[in-house]
Amino acid sequence: FKSPFNRSNLFYEIRPKHNAEHDIIRFIKQRAGKSGIIYCLSRKKVEELAELLLANGIKALAYHAGMDAQTRANNQDDFLMERVDVIVATIAFGMGIDKPDVRYVIHYDIPKSLEGYYQETGRAGRDGGEGHCLTFYSYKDIQKLEKFMQGKPVAEQEIGKLLLLETVSYAESSMCRRKTLLHYFGEEYGESNCGCCDNCVNPKPKVDAK
């Protein structure tokens, strides 16, 4: 049985967001020369993080909708042609990007929905090689996202909150990430241990992100 949703070559990991910048620099340096995408929610964070990586000797560029089209196109080409290793982006990046050998996708901020998470992490390992999907989680980020929703139409707020709750329970769960993700898409994952997510490799007490 082959599941259309199961990306068996992707490793899913959630970390509490205590010292994310430091963790990201270490993570990338351990994978020198490999291609990766880092997603942030705000353009400001995209710029800051790209600068921080450059200052730490990592070839990185920013990408977001606030940049002019030419700069965006150039930065995208530099990433595709491997003149840089890392693109730090808002979710505007990746639509129609086909780079098969992206080795990791990092979410600096928790995505607004599991569907978004699945789509964005799915940009790793399209060549069938390994892909590491690392997400940083803190409850502060959730509160920030909830604040963003205020002022939107009530129905939209309700849907947004539900989607966010699903992401929170995924992040805080100690169950197999793959099982939870597939269940969300209406599929059951038969194995009790996928061997390819943080919860299966290092079973741990519940992450309490403060």
Predicted regions and their residues:
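Cys/His-rich short segments
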Residues: 163, 168-210
